[in-house]
Curated annotation (Swiss-Prot):
Family statement: Belongs to the ArgJ family.
High-level lineage: Bacteria, Bacillati, Actinomycetota, Actinomycetes, Mycobacteriales
Encoding gene, per UniProt annotation: argJ
Role of this protein: Catalyzes two activities which are involved in the cyclic version of arginine biosynthesis: the synthesis of N-acetylglutamate from glutamate and acetyl-CoA as the acetyl donor, and of ornithine by transacetylation between N(2)-acetylornithine and glutamate.
Chief place where the protein resides: cytoplasm
Protein name: Arginine biosynthesis bifunctional protein ArgJ
Organism listed in the record: Rhodococcoides fascians
Length: 403
C-alpha cells in the first residue's frame, strides 16, 4: 500500500506532515563552505549507514563536469551509498585542475566520515568556468563534524542555487519510506535525468530491479520536463536503497517512486526561473509514445505558447503552430487533431460561441496550473510533459546571473 507522507502543491506550499519519518539508516551533513552568500549552506551530503543498491543517470552534455566524470567512474567500481553536493559553483570547463580539485574534495570528505571515495557520487551546480576556491573549501571541510539523521528539507535547501524554495516529496510503501529532493529552475531540458535529484529509501530493492524501475521512472518524469530547452552540464539523478525496512512489492515501489519524482518535476517546472504558472500538456492518440513526447515538448518549449500563457491571452492558435512545427511526424493529419484547455474544447470547434470560448479559456489561463490536452487521432499512445510560462523575470535572472 502506497501512502502520501509529504507532497507539495504546484507552487511549493507544503501539505501533510512536515516532520514525516525519513527512511532508516541515512545520515546527512549540511554546512556553509563559502561558495554561497553568508548564511546559506552550500555543502550537503547524505550517506547510508550500510551498503546500498543504487541507480544513477547523468547528463549527456559534451561539457559534462568533473563531478560527473568522477561519479561515472565510481559506479563502474561499486554501488555508491551516498552523495555529496556543492552549490553555487558547477566546476565545469575547468580542465585537469577542476578534476583534481573535485577528487581532493571527495577524498577529504570520505576520510572524515570513514568510507571509500568511490562510495560517494559527487555533484556540483552553479556558475560554469570558475575553479573551486580550494583554500576556502579546505577550511570549511575541517569543521565538518558529525552527521545527523536525514533531514531532507535541510539538504534540499543546501543544494539550491536560483531556486526559490526547497523541493521535497515523500511516500510510504508498507514499512518503508521513499524521500526525494531536487533542485533546478533554469538550464532545464534533461536528456537523461534532471538537474539534480536524489531519492533515498530504506526499502530492499535488488540492483537489477532498481535499475529497471528507476530508468523507466526517469523517462516518464525528469525526461518529460522543460523550462528553457537548455540541458545542463551537471545533470545527475540517483536513487539509493539500503534495505533497512525490508522488501516491498515491485509494483508498489515503482508507483511510489514515480509519484515522488512526479511531485519533484512539478515543483521544478512551477519554480522555473521567473515562472508564475505550471504547464501540463498531455498528448494522446499518438502513433507512439515518442511521437506524443515530441509534440508535447514542442508545445511547452514554444516561446509564443509560454508567453501567451503568462499573459493569460487565449490565443490558442499558437498551440496549433507548435504542433505544426513537428513536420518530421509525417502521419500527423491536422483534420484529426483535437485541442482543449483542460476540458474546454477549442479546436476544431467548441460547444460555446467564439466569445464565450475565449472568455472561458482566459479564466483557465488565470489559474496557476494550465492544462493543454491534445488528441492526435492517430493511435493509442499517450505522453505527459511539464513546463512553465516565460516572463520578464526569467530574462532578468539570466542576464544578471554572474553579476
Amino acid at each position: 500500500m502506497v501512502q502520501s507522507v509529504l507532497s507539495s502543491t504546484s507552487h511549493g506550499s507544503e501539505r501533510a506532515d512536515m516532520s514525516a519519518a525519513s527512511p532508516q539508516g541515512f545520515h546527512c551533513w549540511t554546512t556553509h563552505l563559502g561558495l554561497a552568500d553568508e548564511g546559506k549552506d552550500d555543502f550537503s551530503m547524505v550517506i547510508s549507514d550500510r551498503p546500498c543498491t543504487s541507480s544513477v543517470v547523468f547528463t549527456k552534455s559534451l561539457f559534462a563536469g568533473p563531478c560527473v566524470t568522477l561519479s561515472k567512474t565510481s559506479i563502474e567500481q561499486t554501488s555508491p551509498r551516498g552523495v555529496l553536493v556543492l552549490a553555487k559553483n558547477a566546476n565545469v570547463a575547468t580542465g585537469a585542475e577542476g578534476l583534481r580539485n573535485a577528487s581532493e574534495i571527495r577524498a577529504s570528505v570520505a576520510r572524515t566520515v570513514g568510507i571509500e571515495p568511490d562510495a560517494l557520487i559527487m555533484a556540483s551546480t552553479g556558475v560554469i568556468g570558475v575553479q573551486y576556491p580550494m583554500d576556502t573549501i579546505r577550511a570549511g571541510l575541517d569543521g565538518l563534524g558529525q552527521g545527523t539523521p536525514l533531514d531532507a528539507h535541510a539538504v534540499a535547501r543546501a543544494i539550491m542555487t536560483t531556486d526559490t524554495r526547497a523541493k521535497v516529496s515523500e511516500r510510504a510503501v508498507g514499512t518503508s519510506t521513499i524521500v526525494g529532493i531536487a533542485k533546478g529552475v533554469g538550464m532545464i531540458e534533461p536528456d537523461m535525468a534532471t538537474m539534480l535529484s536524489f531519492v533515498f529509501t530504506d526499502a530492499d530493492v535488488p540492483q537489477d530491479t532498481l535499475n529497471r524501475i528507476f530508468r523507466d521512472v526517469v523517462d516518464r518524469t525528469y525526461n518529460s520536463v522543460s523550462i528553457d530547452t537548455d540541458t545542463s552540464t551537471s545533470d545527475t539523478a540517483a536513487v539509493f536503497a539500503n534495505g533497512s525496512a525490508g522488501p516491498v512489492p515491485d509494483t508498489e515501489f515503482e508507483q511510489a517512486l514515480e509519484e515522488v519524482c512526479t511531485d519533484l518535476v512539478k515543483m521544478i517546472a512551477s519554480d522555473g526561473e521567473g515562472a508564475t504558472k505550471l504547464i501540463v500538456t498531455t498528448v494522446s492518440g499518438a502513433s507512439s509514445e515518442r511521437q506524443a513526447r515530441v509534440v508535447g515538448k514542442s508545445i511547452i518549449n514554444s516561446p509564443l505558447v509560454k508567453t501567451m500563457i503568462h499573459g493569460e491571452d487565449p490565443n490558442w492558435g499558437r498551440v496549433l503552430m507548435a504542433i505544426g512545427k513537428c513536420s518530421n511526424e509525417v502521419d500527423i493529419e491536422p483534420d484529426r487533431i483535437r485541442v482543449a484547455f483542460a476540458d474546454i474544447d477549442v479546436y476544431p470547434s467548441s460547444s460555446l460561441d467564439q466569445h464565450d470560448t475565449v472568455e472561458v479559456v482566459r479564466e483557465h489561463l488565470a489559474t496557476v496550473t494550465v492544462e493543454i490536452n491534445v488528441d492526435l487521432g492517430i493511435g493509442t499512445d499517450t505522453w505527459r510533459v511539464f513546463g512553465c510560462d516565460l516572463t520578464d523575470e526569467y530574462i532578468r535572472i539570466n542576464a544578471d546571473y554572474t553579476t
